[in-house]
């Protein structure tokens, strides 16, 4: 028959009574009385009896809330009176529990002690002792830990409460203390290569706008090249590319350039593809070279020299016309008004060179009036009639015929440029109309408000001057050839 072992019952004293929150004065009275809460109506919250209970003639009772909520601790880390009372009760219960476990382990047999160690009693976080900010070190040395010991082969770290005990409210001081990280197996306790100081970040000098922009430009210089140069040698070595692109227009961009959506994007794209700079270089080259208009006295070697110079001039003009055609084929800057204006001046300059070649005299006895001043960029009908009325010899008529046979190239160039000028003229006219009526935005994406400083009348005048100069030059050459 099994006997009842009363040794363990007599040896283990009874547990300490559990102190409830209601006994500590931490409960909270409900805002609504029991009658209003049961009836699901709004309570007037009148103590000690609400008006609704009085009107109904029933007893008004206020009960304690089931969830009173947590009490906040003060800034120094000390708990409130309710928390301190519960902490004291918990610490006393834990100390009595530890003494009971020690006495039971000394009196009980090894089997019972092993069973107790293998099955520890479940504890909650509120039963654990909380160290105070004043005596954290003492709490670590006197208060026992009821947590199971950690495995030393993995991590030998003290509990968090013991680590943060002397640093209850200063977390950064914990990071600055090297002894906290000493138990880690792969961590250097010297802390010479790690700086956890929080003030070093605020002591760094603030970077101003100039330094920040300079830093960005330094980074950009490593990623983006300063200049973009085209491989002209490979382009000229290709027979197809060399035949399609003239020698003077080897660096003119092709239609593969990215399309522009707005005027600012178009302007930036034109600057990146160097269309405007190429147009200015062409205009500068045309202005620097002079046409052979000086008369010669004899029909011998001088006639051959004049004809060769006229042929060279027409060859250069042909190359200039091809360059301008390539400029107009660039899709990224086709709406750039400044580029169109520069191209119009180039066309007028080419017509002026053709007129100078048509005025070249061979074997004449009279002297020509000479080249027209460089300031007269735009010729008119009377200006063309005056020099073209002095053709005396066969050499002069040959030069005029050669010029007349080349004017169809200029006609194609004007026909290519004219739609672009009209498109920009219409867009600028609508933009000026919007601004005149007080509208600062345009009706659609294609209309740009004040996209250029050139007025629409300027573009219309340039188109009219090109067509007038071309028709006047061809008509005068035909009339003089018929008269002679």
Curated annotation (Swiss-Prot):
GO terms for biological process: aflatoxin biosynthetic process. InterPro entries: AflR, OAF3, Zn2-C6_fun-type_DNA-bd_sf, Zn2Cys6_DnaBD. Residues 139-154, 368-378 have a biased composition (Polar residues). GO terms for molecular function: DNA binding; DNA-binding transcription factor activity, RNA polymerase II-specific; zinc ion binding. Residues 33-60 bind DNA. Residues 70-154, 363-387 are annotated as: Disordered. GO terms for cellular component: nucleus. Keywords: DNA-binding, Metal-binding, Nucleus, Transcription, Transcription regulation, Zinc. This is Notoamide biosynthesis transcriptional activator notL. It comes from Aspergillus sp. (strain MF297-2).
